[in-house]
Design a protein with these regions (language model features):
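Positively charged n-region of N-terminal signal peptides that target proteins for export
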Residues: 1-5, 112
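Bacterial Sec-dependent N-terminal signal peptides
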Residues: 2, 13-38
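Sec-dependent N-terminal signal peptides
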Residues: 6-11
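Short, solvent-exposed loop/linker segments at the N-terminal edge
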Residues: 39-44
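Surface-exposed binding patches on compact interaction domains or structured appendages
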Residues: 45-96
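Extracellular/luminal low-complexity segments enriched in Ser/Thr/Pro
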Residues: 93-108
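C-terminal edge beta-strand
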Residues: 95, 118-131
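A short beta-strand micro-motif common to beta-rich folds, especially ectodomain repeats
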Residues: 104-118
Length: 131
């Protein structure tokens, strides 16, 4: 009886230790394959199209400025815009970014987040100040 108790306790502890994992949310493997981490624009209105190398099942999550976050709550949204920035998923492997003219005397910074499952990819967008 005592051996059975020890055996069951051992199996239970073994099961608990095996089932625990240290997976961190957002630390998935790169399934997007976008090599560009930073995009630089001059102060005038400008645009760029970026291409992904890997997956095509990603979606736009948010764009943010220093003080505002523009977030989507649907996987089907293809466009996010706000603060003078327009981001669109134009194809299965392409993302289009357009920025309005910077009329301030300060550099503008935006962050765009795209997501594929548990993997998040951040693109930093920097626009020069008006000269």
């Amino acid at each position: 009886m005592r051996q059975t108790y020890y055996f069951l306790s051992f199996v239970l502890l073994l099961f608990v230790f095996i089932s625990c994992s240290d997976d961190v949310v957002g630390k998935g493997t790169d399934t997007i394959g976008l090599e560009t981490k930073e995009v630089f624009f001059k102060s005038s209105k400008d645009s760029i199209e970026l291409r992904t190398r890997k997956g095509d099942d990603w979606w736009l999550t948010e764009i943010s400025t220093k003080d505002t976050i523009y977030r989507t709550h649907s996987l089907n949204v293809q466009v996010i815009e706000g603060g003078g920035l327009y981001v669109e998923k134009t194809g299965r492997k392409s993302i289009f970014i357009r920025i309005d003219s910077n009329l301030t005397g300060l550099e503008r910074r935006f962050t765009t987040v795209i997501q594929a499952g548990n993997y998040y990819y951040t693109i930093t967008i920097i626009q020069k100040a008006k000269e």
